[in-house]
């Protein structure tokens, strides 16, 4: 792998503000009142949705962050795939994207060219058009996209809406944050990084298109708040989810690195925010860290009727990405999340 970006500190979605700090600020922002704003920021959804006609709504999102890999082209691909993912988590289709660039004035512009090339290729793969962007000089590289998509107003996937007996399905393996952390200190194997990069550069477009054929009750993508943080947002303290940890897909090496305490500060922020809602029926430390691990360009997490779960899983297996039925929803218990 070509190594040209050598300052990967807290890159990817590990760079996000912690959920507790973010909630503290957003709770003080007045909520917009417009009947055509179908999804705003009040529900922790992945993107905003605004209705422009009876049949069409626009989906808007943006995401950018510092590098988590040292190859600029791959970084561009990952950052773009991550930004595009929010449209797919809502059930929409990508139409246009704008580059968001922070770049040091004294750095080789060829590096920026490689980042933008990687990003553009993912936008094209998504079926979208790169239509422009904005750049500023900064001490560190940061890159991402502002993305616009479309969706039918009656077919939006929200992150709320789970129902008792629903099955929870995850479409990508966990552990990329832990592996990137291990790589920054020279402890990750090439095989582990290859697995992480394959996951992070895979668009959620394909999984989203599959699950739209079914009755999806709630959906989100797993990113900086980790699986348990995003699951907490889905449950809204109204239901309980039972997670079968042995059914959760993850990259094997991430488990080994977690046992060696190669874990992220962002993962610990996620643990601190969510842990009071959790009951552990297993003392597997490494698995706990994987469940809290911030993901960059992570998979879709969705709830669905139990009778559809196995058929959806069969369809998803055709994408050749580890996925699984990881748990189920039940009426609210003493704790919101139970880990078995």
From Swiss-Prot:
One of its GO terms (molecular function) is magnesium ion binding. Binds 1 Mg(2+) ion per monomer. Its cofactor is Mg(2+). Transmembrane segments: none annotated. It catalyses: hydrogenselenide + ATP + H2O = selenophosphate + AMP + phosphate + 2 H(+). The record marks 16 as: Important for catalytic activity. Disulfide bonds: none annotated. ATP binds at residues 16, 43-45, 63, 86, 133-135. It comes from the Bacteria. Pfam families: AIRS (PF00586), AIRS_C (PF02769). One of its GO terms (biological process) is selenocysteine biosynthetic process. Keywords: ATP-binding, Kinase, Magnesium, Metal-binding, Nucleotide-binding, Selenium, Transferase. The active site is at residue 13. It is an enzyme of class 2 (transferase). Mg(2+) binds at residues 46, 86, 221. Its EC number is 2.7.9.3. PANTHER family: INACTIVE SELENIDE, WATER DIKINASE-LIKE PROTEIN-RELATED (PTHR10256:SF0), SELENIDE, WATER DIKINASE (PTHR10256). Homodimer. HAMAP family: SelD (MF_00625). Belongs to the selenophosphate synthase 1 family. Class I subfamily. This is Selenide, water dikinase. The lineage of its organism: Bacteria, Bacillati, Bacillota, Clostridia, Lachnospirales.
